[in-house]
């Protein structure tokens, strides 16, 4: 295997991984779990300082195993029952007594959450005080990327600032990667080297099944399934994609105790990169090797596109994640590389106006809409229809990706600010 392909596998293994609960509040839970471990005693007070974007994406989402919403319960639960060794699955073994203990801290006014001015989009600093000591943990640039630890005001760990951060924001820096090279890797790599990606199907389909079995959030997936059962809607590949993607997001945003296989720090985006591809593969009776190759396109393609703009912004990441899913869906249908590129162009054209106004139950609608766009865009591409040189869509897919990155990075910060101020008011 050449060195570039090894880099691709490293990227995938670093960025496509299980996460229990929405990753923004889980970031705070992870930080407090580490700080409490440093203390060696029970937490008595917890102060949480977060970036505007982390604040935005934590306000309306349920925290797994708690039945509650927001940063305060996430941070408190991380301190009372989090396992710092579990990373993004820090709350996987949280007990009800630990949840009760966390709620008692909140009710006593011992957990405070504040926004902090910072240039980082993913940023969380926690100060946890016990009876004898106090510990401070700072995460910056990635949901579990600790850059500093302090115990009783003494720095006991500091990340070397000269080293490149292992965060999603920079993970493609210095890597020779394009849509063409991703396609080449996906179609020619040895199956044994890429079959690890199949775990995405197991986790995200299980999450979808949970969302169909039990009521979570807006019950988008269950509602569509109910209307198919009554005959108002017809069952089809398109409806299956909508139902399963929405149901998985329903469950995730509703605090289901099951992990998602995330993409770029987002469980919903992991769902968007996985489930439409699974459903297309099922339709064509694709074998595991073909599915794995399609997953490489959807997951690595999504990572590559999203590396052109900040990891948290005013733009809904499911939009371009679904563009990469559309690329994979064309491949599964027997389309050409050129048609896969057309699918990306079509999806970005369709979804480029979708904003992010925080992680919450309505994400299930956006995930479903993005997945349906991937289906629509792949069908257009397979019939040789492609959006070109219209709006932000260029003649070439690489230029389109650069355009969308520019639009988000330089054009949307003010929109993001206003969204956050509206939500906080």
Swiss-Prot record:
GO biological process: L-cysteine catabolic process to pyruvate
Gene Ontology terms for molecular function: L-cysteine desulfhydrase activity
Pfam families: SDH_alpha (PF03313)
Database matches in InterPro entries: Ser_deHydtase-like_asu, UPF0597
Domain of life: Bacteria
UniProt similarity note: Belongs to the UPF0597 family.
UniProt protein name: UPF0597 protein VSAL_I0741
Organism name: Aliivibrio salmonicida (strain LFI1238) (Vibrio salmonicida (strain LFI1238))
């Amino acid at each position: 295997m050449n060195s570039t392909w090894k880099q691709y596998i490293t990227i995938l293994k670093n960025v496509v991984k299980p996460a229990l609960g929405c990753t923004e509040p889980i970031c705070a839970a992870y930080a407090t779990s580490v700080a409490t471990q440093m203390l060696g005693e029970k937490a008595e007070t917890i102060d949480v300082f977060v970036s505007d974007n982390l604040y935005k994406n934590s306000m309306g989402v349920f925290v797994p195993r708690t039945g509650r919403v927001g940063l305060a319960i996430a941070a408190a639960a991380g301190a009372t029952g989090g396992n710092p060794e579990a990373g993004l699955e820090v709350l996987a073994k949280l007990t009800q007594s630990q949840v009760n203990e966390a709620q008692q801290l909140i009710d006593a006014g011992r957990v405070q959450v504040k926004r902090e001015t910072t240039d980082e989009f993913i940023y969380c600093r926690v100060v946890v005080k016990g009876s004898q000591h106090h510990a401070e943990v700072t995460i910056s640039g990635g949901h579990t990327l600790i850059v500093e630890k302090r115990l009783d005001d003494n720095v006991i760990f500091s990340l070397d600032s000269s080293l490149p951060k292992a965060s999603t924001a920079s993970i493609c820096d210095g890597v020779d990667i394009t849509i063409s090279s991703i396609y080449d890797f996906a179609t020619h790599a040895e199956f044994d080297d890429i079959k690890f990606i199949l775990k995405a199907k197991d986790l995200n389909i299980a999450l979808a099944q949970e969302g169909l079995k039990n009521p979570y959030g807006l019950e988008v997936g269950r509602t569509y399934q109910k209307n198919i059962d009554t005959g108002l809607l017809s069952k089809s590949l398109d409806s299956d994609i909508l139902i399963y993607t929405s149901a998985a997001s329903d469950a995730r945003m509703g605090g289901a105790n099951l992990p998602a296989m995330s993409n770029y720090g987002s469980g919903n985006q992991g769902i968007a990169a996985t489930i439409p591809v699974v459903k297309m593969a099922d339709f064509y009776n694709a074998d595991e090797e073909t599915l794995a190759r399609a997953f490489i396109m959807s997951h690595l393609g999504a990572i590559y596109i999203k590396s052109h703009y900040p990891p948290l912004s005013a733009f809904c990441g499911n939009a371009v994640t679904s563009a990469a899913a559309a690329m994979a869906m064309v491949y599964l249908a027997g389309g050409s590389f050129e048609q896969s590129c057309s699918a990306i162009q079509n999806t970005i054209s369709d979804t480029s106006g979708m904003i992010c106004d925080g992680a919450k139950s309505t994400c299930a609608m956006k995930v479903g809409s993005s997945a349906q766009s991937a289906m629509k865009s792949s069908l257009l591409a397979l019939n040789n229809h492609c959006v070109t040189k219209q709006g932000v869509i260029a003649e070439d897919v690489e230029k389109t990706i650069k355009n969308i990155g520019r639009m988000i990075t330089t054009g949307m910060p003010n929109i993001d600010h206003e969204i956050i101020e509206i939500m906080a008011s």
